[in-house]
C-alpha cells in the first residue's frame, strides 16, 4: 500500500461558553456518544479526548468544560482545565450559539483567546434554528471583535456543513502519522464514560440546584460468566433533600435514571447490563479539595 505523504494529525480544542453544543458537535463528528449532553450549563466537567480517524487525517478533539466565571472550587478546576487545553493544541474551535446574542460569556472567552497564537476557527452552531439571512450579521459581529483563521456556520444536531468544518480544520494540522490506533475513539476509561452516562440522566430528569450538585462514581464493574456486565455506581449529592429528590417517591426517580442510563450503557458496551445505583450525601463536595481529588478533579485523568 502506497504511503500517503500528505497525511495530517493534530489536536483541536473545542471551546465556548456552556450550552452552545460543543459535546453534540464532537459526538456527531466521531459518530459515537462519548461526551454527555444536556441543556444544563457546565455539563462537561473534565477535558474529554475524542478521536476522528479518516484516510487523510487524524483529528484529536479535546472537548473542554465551558469557560465561565467560576463560583466554587469545582468551577475553578473546570475553567483551568479548559484554558490549559489551549496551550496543547494545533487549532481551536470557538463554538457559539447562532440563536443567542454575543454576551459577557463570549467576551470573557475572546479575552483569553487574545493570548494564544493558535489559529481559531469560529463555529456558528444551531444554524437550523435561525433564518439563513440572520447568519451573516451574527458572523460579522464576531469577526469584528477577533481575527479568526476561519468561519464555518453549522448545525451539529442536523449534521449541516460538518464536512466543510473538517476541511477547514485540516488546513491547520501538521503533516504526520496517526497518534492513536485507527479503531480508538477516546482515551476515557469505560468506567468514566459509564459514570458520565448516569450523570447525564440525572441532568435530564432533575432541575434547580440538583444537576450541579451531582457527581457519579462507578464502584464496581465486572463481567459475569454469562457475559452480562454488573455495574454498581454511586450518585453523590450535597444535601439530604437532594438525595430524596434523586431517589423519588418509592424509588421512582432512581429507577427512571437507571433505566435510561442502562440503555445507553448497553449500547456503549454491546452487552446486557445490570445497573445497581446508590445515592449518598457528601456535604458541599464542590468546595472541598479532598473530595474533589477523590472524584478525579484537580489533576490530569
Regions found by a protein language model. Give the residues of each.
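Conserved, well-folded catalytic cores of nucleic-acid-processing
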Residues: 32, 51-55, 70, 85-92, ...
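Conserved C-terminal guanine-recognition region of P-loop GTPase G domains, centered on the G4
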Residues: 53-58, 80-151, 222-226
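Canonical P-loop GTPase G-domain recognition
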Residues: 118-119, 128-186, 190
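Catalytic P-loop NTPase motifs of RecA-like helicase/translocase cores
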Residues: 44, 67-69, 101-102, 130-131, ...
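Conserved glycine(s) of the Walker
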Residues: 21, 161, 253
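Conserved G1/Walker A P-loop phosphate-binding module
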Residues: 1-88, 96
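P-loop NTP-binding site
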Residues: 190-301
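Active-site glycine-centered loops adjacent to acidic/histidine catalytic or metal-binding residues
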Residues: 63, 125, 155
Amino acid at each position: 500500500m502506497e504511503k500517503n505523504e500528505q497525511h495530517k494529525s493534530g489536536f483541536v480544542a473545542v471551546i465556548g461558553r456552556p450550552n452552545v453544543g460543543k459535546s453534540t458537535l464532537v459526538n456527531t463528528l466521531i459518530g459515537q456518544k462519548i461526551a454527555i449532553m444536556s441543556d444544563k450549563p457546565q455539563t462537561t466537567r473534565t477535558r474529554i479526548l475524542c478521536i476522528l480517524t479518516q484516510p487523510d487525517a487524524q483529528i484529536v478533539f479535546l472537548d473542554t468544560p465551558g469557560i465561565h466565571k467560576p463560583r466554587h472550587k469545582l468551577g475553578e478546576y473546570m475553567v483551568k482545565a479548559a484554558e490549559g487545553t489551549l496551550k496543547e493544541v494545533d487549532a481551536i474551535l470557538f463554538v457559539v450559539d447562532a440563536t443567542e446574542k454575543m454576551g459577557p460569556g463570549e467576551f470573557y472567552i475572546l479575552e483569553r483567546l487574545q493570548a494564544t497564537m493558535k489559529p481559531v476557527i469560529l463555529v456558528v452552531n444551531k444554524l437550523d434554528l435561525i433564518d439563513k439571512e440572520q447568519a451573516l450579521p451574527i458572523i460579522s459581529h464576531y469577526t469584528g471583535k477577533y481575527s479568526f483563521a476561519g468561519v464555518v456556520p453549522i448545525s451539529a444536531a442536523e449534521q449541516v456543513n460538518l464536512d466543510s468544518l473538517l476541511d477547514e480544520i485540516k488546513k491547520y494540522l501538521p503533516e504526520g502519522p496517526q497518534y492513536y490506533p485507527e479503531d480508538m475513539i477516546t482515551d476515557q476509561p469505560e468506567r468514566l464514560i459509564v459514570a458520565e452516562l448516569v450523570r447525564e440522566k440525572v441532568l435530564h430528569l432533575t432541575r434547580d440546584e440538583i444537576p450541579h450538585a451531582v457527581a457519579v462514581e462507578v464502584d464496581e464493574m465486572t463481567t459475569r460468566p454469562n457475559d452480562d456486565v454488573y455495574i454498581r455506581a454511586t450518585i453523590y449529592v450535597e444535601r439530604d433533600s437532594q438525595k430524596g429528590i434523586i431517589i423519588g417517591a418509592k424509588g421512582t426517580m432512581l429507577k427512571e435514571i437507571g433505566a435510561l442510563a442502562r440503555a445507553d450503557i448497553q449500547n456503549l458496551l454491546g452487552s446486557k447490563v445490570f445497573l445497581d445505583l446508590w445515592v449518598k450525601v457528601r456535604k458541599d463536595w464542590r468546595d472541598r479539595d479532598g473530595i474533589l481529588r477523590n472524584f478525579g478533579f484537580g489533576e490530569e485523568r
